Amino acid sequence: MVTLVAVVALVYLGLCGVLFLYQRNLIYFPQPRSSGSGATTLTLPADGAQVLVTPRQRGGPNALLYFGGNAEDVSYSLPGLSTAFPDYAIYLLHYRGYGGSSGKPSEAALFADALTLFDQVHADHQNIEVVGRSLGSGVAVHLASLRPVTRLVLVTPYDSLQELAAQQFPYFPVRWLLLDKFESWRYAEHVVVPTLVVAAEHDEIIPRTSSEALFKHFRTGAASFKVVAGTSHNTISESPEYMPLLKGAPRERSGG
């Protein structure tokens, strides 16, 4: 009996070790940049990596920064965003390891690169709006808590990657093992600009309850919440409501 318990304990510890060592392989799913996108790229100054940005450059005060979801080639979002924001310069960040950027993705690296991108863009554009989708929502809310963005839109966001992982692996001490926690709720209360949280009605990846939990951490009156009916995690951008929401729609639910 003692031997059996010891074997089970060793197997469990071994599985914990595998989860710890390969956790970033389970979190990030880098995609190459499609050669068919036709978009040019800029190189962002970054420590230890060549980080690419797909731009649509424009003069004037307005700019939009877009941080995409996991396994997303953000360059494909450029045509739609260009139509929706005709007078804006647009910058789409290819995370490290994604879309031709070198290096490996991590929470710290994504946060640092987003700050660098903002600082570089802010030198030419006074009014910067930020959109973060799914994985990118964590990058966007962190950025907005530290820099003077003018508006923030979070599409299918989570309150904490740590909480999502704990739900997915309930029998493992995920909170102790996870390196990249993406605790967006910690940053939400420091965001002072108008914020829109957009959830998919039938999100099978990030439960709507996670988006609602994040929403509750924003200051009272700072954020609004919108559920896009009939959409899932990956189809929300196909809704006719999607681009108007990114551009700026009337508030559905205010609070925090």
Cite the ranges covered by each PLM segment.
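Catalytic histidine-centered segment of alpha/beta-hydrolase-like enzymes
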Residues: I205, T231-E241
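An N-terminal hydrophobic leader/cap segment in hydrolases
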Residues: L4-P45
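Membrane-embedded segments
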Residues: Q50-Q120, R133, S137-G138, A144
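Short beta-strand/loop motif that positions the catalytic acidic residue
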Residues: V191-V192, V197-D203
